[in-house]
């Protein structure tokens, strides 16, 4: 029999190898966690020696101004290479030994993976690492490092991209280009790790393989994903049958109906978790198998054992269902005590009134108040003659059709402009001053004043503090900024004035940054970060979740405030959250896990 006739591309043999895959993942992730933990501790100590507690998106100059900076960059690259070794290389090496029927020794695999790093110490290797770290997660390519698997384009950037058709098309074109780069280089790592090719030769080899076999490769991709879908459906069918039986038996028993709902939700959660954790390993085995075929390499290549696989499936099914039944019974018995919660998350209107009124205007503040928002966030900049006006952009081009910047104009000149929000073309306004906004907000809503633009400096802090004190509103305002040095200045000189630091990227002891509030970008707000911030008696704001699902997600966490454009939707979501049905409570909790 020819070697290629031995090859099977069904998902069944992969399921048979699942116990070994799970054991390998457990050990590889544990080893990787330990190594990275050591690097994080050393990196944190290096940051502390600079007199700071963290590096963030608004305070990263130490990377090029101190001797610790280059060391931190080297350690960051070292972390990426470690992830490359123990996150992806181990999977390919493991898959090759599994396919060849060799005895799998974890120590040998980890040793080989660690020393494989040397093959990437060149420009081509660095390019591969950076692609898998930064680009693959964003474009959705199947291979990526778990370190950055949730990497995203920050909302404040993506909103700009999607608001302009040309930006959107350019981004789409880039995504397609990078996807094709990933596709044509899908076998590059296999060439490096299995055939011991240098990076550039492995690239050429992978592209040659795809050009010759692209139809067969795409067909096998389809079969792989089809089989995954079939097992998803099979699992769901079994669960649905059990649910129908339960519903028929306990149709008039609300307590048992809730048990069934819990069981469905937990089963789906486990299915998603297990599939997600094992998917890349299965995918690597499939791709490695194809590499053996296309390169004419011999091996045992996972022969099918359908009887064993059949019993394996039902054993795994029972292994998951029994604990899920017991957990569902426990949660159902203590449902209110464990699962039901109310929220008092405060809603903050972005740019005065969010999408409910022209941005950064008095009408915006009035709209935020009318919808029951806790706060209103505004952006201030200084004029040429020293006054403070409310405007987000670097100039007035978007809203006033004037390309001049606030610092280039006097207050009188700015007051002659007509502000027309594209979302409210029939509702022209005048550019508001800080004082006008303060008067509208006093004793009605908390103002979050962002120190914005080129004029955001210590003078701005001093002037704004003076103004809000004169208005007797020091306890009704929070000064916020993306510039950490300004927030540190507020805390140092005006400790009784509340301050908030906004950041979308941070490393180190972020919670110890000198501020009263920390504002984190949507996807950067994690449960562990929330707990750490609260442990230091600080408050946390998340910006800017506009989709209802994301707002509902954060209502189910311990964040203090949500900054959003969709204020009406968010305040209604708070009310709905506090009046949820049992099934809504269950679905919200399951959603929050992911």
Model-identified regions with their sequence ranges:
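Phosphate-group recognition and catalysis centered on beta-loop-alpha active-site segments
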Residues: 295-594
């Amino acid at each position: 029999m020819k070697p290629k006739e031995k090859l099977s591309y069904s998902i069944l043999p992969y399921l048979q190898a699942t116990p070994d895959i799970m054991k390998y993942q457990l050990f590889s992730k544990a080893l990787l966690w330990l190594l990275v933990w050591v690097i994080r501790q050393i990196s944190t100590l290096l940051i502390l020696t600079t007199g700071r507690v963290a590096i963030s998106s608004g305070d990263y100059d130490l990377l090029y101004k101190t001797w610790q900076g280059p060391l931190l960059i080297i350690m960051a690259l070292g972390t990426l290479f470690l992830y490359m070794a123990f996150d992806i290389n181990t999977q390919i090496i493991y898959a090759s030994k599994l396919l060849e029927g060799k005895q799998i020794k974890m120590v040998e695999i980890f040793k080989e993976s660690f020393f494989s790093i040397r093959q990437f110490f060149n420009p081509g290797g660095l390019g591969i690492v950076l692609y898998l770290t930064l680009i693959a997660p964003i474009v959705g390519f199947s291979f990526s490092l778990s370190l950055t698997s949730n990497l995203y384009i920050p909302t404040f950037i993506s909103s700009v991209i999607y608001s302009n058709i040309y930006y959107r098309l350019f981004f789409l074109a880039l995504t397609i280009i990078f996807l094709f780069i990933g596709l044509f280089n899908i076998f590059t790592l296999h060439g490096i790790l299995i055939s011991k090719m240098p990076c550039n030769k492995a690239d050429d080899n992978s592209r040659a393989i795809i050009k010759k076999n692209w139809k067969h490769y795409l067909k096998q991709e389809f079969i792989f994903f089809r089989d995954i879908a079939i097992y998803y459906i099979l699992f769901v069918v079994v669960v649905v049958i059990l649910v129908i039986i339960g519903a028929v038996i306990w149709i008039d028993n609300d307590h048992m109906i809730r048990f069934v709902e819990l069981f469905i939700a937990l089963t789906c959660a486990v299915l998603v978790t297990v599939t997600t954790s094992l998917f890349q390993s299965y995918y690597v085995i499939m791709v490695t198998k194809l590499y053996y075929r296309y390169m004419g390499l011999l091996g045992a290549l996972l022969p099918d054992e359908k009887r064993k696989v059949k019993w394996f499936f039902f054993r795994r099914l029972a292994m998951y269902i029994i604990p899920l039944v017991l957990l569902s019974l426990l949660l159902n018995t203590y449902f209110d005590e464990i699962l039901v919660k109310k929220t008092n998350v405060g809603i903050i209107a972005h740019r005065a009134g969010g999408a409910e009124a022209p941005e950064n205007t008095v009408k915006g503040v009035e709209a935020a108040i009318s919808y029951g928002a806790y706060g209103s966030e505004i952006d201030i900049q200084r004029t040429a003659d020293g006054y403070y006006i409310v405007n987000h952009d670097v100039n007035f081009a978007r809203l006033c059709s004037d390309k001049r910047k606030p610092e280039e104009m006097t207050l009188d000149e700015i007051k002659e402009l007509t502000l027309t929000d594209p979302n409210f073309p029939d509702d022209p306004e005048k550019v508001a001053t800080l004082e006008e906004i303060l008067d509208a907000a006093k004793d009605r809503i908390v103002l979050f004043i962002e120190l914005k633009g080129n004029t955001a400096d210590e003078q701005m802090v001093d002037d704004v503090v003076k103004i809000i004190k004169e208005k007797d509103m020091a306890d009704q305002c929070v000064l916020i900024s993306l510039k950490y040095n300004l927030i540190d200045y507020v805390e140092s000189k005006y400790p009784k004035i509340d301050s908030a630091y906004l950041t979308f990227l941070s490393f180190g002891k972020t919670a110890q940054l000198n501020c009263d509030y920390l504002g984190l970008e949507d996807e950067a707000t994690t449960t562990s970060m929330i707990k750490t911030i609260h442990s230091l008696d600080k408050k946390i704001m998340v910006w800017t979740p506009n989709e209802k699902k994301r707002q509902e997600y954060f209502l189910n966490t311990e964040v203090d405030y949500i900054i959003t454009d969709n204020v009406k939707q968010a305040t209604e979501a708070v009310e709905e959250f506090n009046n949820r049905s049992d099934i809504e409570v269950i679905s919200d909790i399951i959603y929050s896990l992911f």
